[in-house]
Amino acid sequence: MYKLLKKSGKARRGEFTTPHGVIQTPVFMNVGTLAAIKGAVSSMDLKEIGCQVELSNTYHLHLRPGDEVVKKMGGLHKFMNWDRPILTDSGGFQVFSLSKIRKIQEEGVYFNSHIDGRKIFMGPEESMRIQSNLASTIAMAFDECVENPAPREYVEKSVERTTRWLHRCKDEMNRLNSLPDTINNKQMLFGINQGGTYEDIRIEHAKTIAKMDLDGYAIGGLAVGESHEDMYRIIDAVVPHLPEDKPIYLMGVGIPSNILEAVDRGVDFFDCVLPARNGRHAHVFTKEGKINLLNAKFELDDKPIDEGCQCPACKHYTRSYIRHLFKAKEMLAMRLCVLHNLYFYNNLMEEIRDAIDGDYFKEYKERKLKEWGGRA
């Protein structure tokens, strides 16, 4: 259940109550594709840096170790030792982005595994069954994510199919939640708005799925080739047509400036691999924007990554030392930078929540964008 606590302009401060705890929103979900954050970051680390929600990937966990294995181990929460909310995506995005060979039909999608090439089928019911086996807190509906730009006629047909798939997802989720051997029989379902960059298709689809009384709603199919201006235009068009008493999730968007702009437009949930991926390559976020620790100017820099930051890396190590670790190819380098970036993101969301609570979000947003100077 979502409770709207405060608004500052269109920015929303809320609480989302789930079977695994209350999520304070706006929130950034830390992406652990295979039930782990890449960069040697543990579930204990995630708690220390303030992570509220972990996101795992249905497609990848279905292939490795297999959702049946996870179910036999008691579900994702027990498997990875995490007692806070977990969101699993439906696998749809990976099916359409990773599979070179795929065939879309009404019942679902036939595709080849990116690991061993074997033929796999996934449709709405299969996605729900896999996510039920994983026993995540929130399951995402199975949808088709089209590339931007895509021909209007194709997008229209795709959205109609995605809507039919959503009805099938909801029916299957209700069935699974009623079974005696289901680990999490209170699993929640979010629907996904699609429609490419066509505002009218997006709006009509938002109106359609809003009637389905789902636990939350996502805006999908963005950050896949369109400009930031197009992204903001679509968010502006869609948000007013989604229920105000449900959380809104902007999928896969994680550039800090994009997060601020989306919060300003009423978005509550975010996820992205960006902080961990950047951290593994020595790109770290600071109050002044993103920096690359491999640059020669940091060789003798005795400052922490970001002065004033309370993350484990900044409290104990210098830029010079971490740069040395990267040059020496020590795994600790990646771990420290991933920890820092995840802390930066979770701390950013805490500051955003405080700014909405204090009704100064507009001023906060403008100040942060000015400080970052286009570098974050």
UniProtKB/Swiss-Prot annotation:
Give the matching NCBIfam families: Q_tRNA_tgt, tgt_general
Instruction: Summarize subunit and interaction data from the UniProt record for this chain.
Output: Homodimer. Within each dimer, one monomer is responsible for RNA recognition and catalysis, while the other monomer binds to the replacement base PreQ1.
**Cofactor(s) annotated in UniProt:** Zn(2+)
* Domain of life the protein comes from: Bacteria
Which residues does the annotated region (RNA binding) include? 252-258, 276-280
Please give the InterPro entries that the UniProt record associates with this protein. Answer: ArchSynthase1/Queuine_TRR, TGT, TGT-like_sf, tRNA_ribo_trans-like
Q: Which residues cross the membrane?
A: none
Molecular function terms in GO for this entry? Answer: metal ion binding; tRNA-guanosine(34) queuine transglycosylase activity
Reactions it catalyzes: 7-aminomethyl-7-carbaguanine + guanosine(34) in tRNA = 7-aminomethyl-7-carbaguanosine(34) in tRNA + guanine
What this protein is called in its record is Queuine tRNA-ribosyltransferase
Cofactor note text = Binds 1 zinc ion per subunit.
Q: Which UniProt keywords apply?
A: Glycosyltransferase, Metal-binding, Queuosine biosynthesis, Transferase, tRNA processing, Zinc
Instruction: Write the Enzyme Commission number(s) for this entry.
Output: 2.4.2.29
The entry marks the following residues as binding Zn(2+), namely C309, C311, C314, H340
Stated family: Belongs to the queuine tRNA-ribosyltransferase family.
- Looking at the keywords, is DNA repair present? no
Q: Which GO terms describe its cellular component?
A: cytosol
- What is the role of the protein in this entry? Catalyzes the base-exchange of a guanine (G) residue with the queuine precursor 7-aminomethyl-7-deazaguanine (PreQ1) at position 34 (anticodon wobble position) in tRNAs with GU(N) anticodons (tRNA-Asp, -Asn, -His and -Tyr). Catalysis occurs through a double-displacement mechanism. The nucleophile active site attacks the C1' of nucleotide 34 to detach the guanine base from the RNA, forming a covalent enzyme-RNA intermediate. The proton acceptor active site deprotonates the incoming PreQ1, allowing a nucleophilic attack on the C1' of the ribose to form the product.
Positions with a binding annotation for substrate = D89, S90, G91, G92, F93, D143, Q194, G221
Write down the species: Clostridium botulinum (strain Langeland / NCTC 10281 / Type F)
Pathway membership, UniProt = tRNA modification; tRNA-queuosine biosynthesis
Identify which top EC class this enzyme belongs to: transferase
- HAMAP family xref list: Q_tRNA_Tgt
In this protein, the active site sits at: D89, D271
Annotated GO biological processes are: queuosine biosynthetic process; tRNA wobble guanine modification; tRNA-guanine transglycosylation
